[in-house]
Regions:
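An acidic/histidine-cluster motif and surrounding catalytic segment
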Residues: 1-62, 66-186
Length: 186
């Protein structure tokens, strides 16, 4: 599966870390240079939409703070439901979710896009609906508008979390403690 990683040009440190993670997993991932904008949220939104617009095959999209917490990536991916549109390999789960099969739960009420796979169908569907200048940050748009509409799944155990680091998006050190939220996958 093709892989893309979103990275700001001035954050070579984050690209170096992410690329090392990909090498350890045996993944070939291309760096996508983030679109610069004075508003960091708009930069993030524009960049996510630009990535979706170039998806022509099933594609893994990572953020540059991704941290793999399991070496079972290919094993878990191979058990994904056949009808998937979007796969989350970790996330901030806000409510209990329904188990579907093997390592996969129906994904609703979940934030974060640090490790997500998209089909071309899902990418097209999102780009037709998402306004990067609108009121939502991309993660929130997916949670509210896309997860209820498409076949979105999240795995347990999580394969990826977000590494604690300074976030250019939030202008502060960010530590999301995502592993704790996987307990909502009953």
């Amino acid at each position: 599966m093709k892989g893309i990683c979103l990275n700001l040009d001035h954050r070579k440190d984050r690209w170096h870390h992410a690329n090392n993670e990909f090498i350890l997993q045996g993944l070939q991932v291309e760096r996508f240079s983030a679109i610069e904008h004075e508003n960091p949220l708009t930069s993030f939104n524009l960049s996510q939409k630009a990535i979706l617009q170039i998806i022509t095959e099933n594609t893994l999209v990572f953020e540059d703070d991704v941290l793999f917490v399991s070496h079972r990536f290919n094993e878990v991916l191979s058990t994904a439901p056949g009808d998937w549109d979007i796969l989350y390999f970790g996330g901030n789960v806000l409510e209990s979710l329904q188990h579907v099969k093997d390592h996969w739960w129906r994904c609703l009420h979940t934030w974060t896009t640090h490790a997500v796979a998209y089909t071309p169908k899902a990418a097209k569907y999102i780009t037709e609906r998402f306004d990067p200048y609108g009121p939502f940050v991309y993660d929130d748009f997916l949670k509210n508008q896309i997860q209820p509409e498409l076949k979105c799944y999240i795995c347990k155990p999580f394969i990826c979390v977000q590494r604690e680091s300074y976030s250019d998006l939030w202008k502060q050190n960010a530590f999301y403690q995502l592993l704790e939220t996987q307990n909502k996958l009953l």
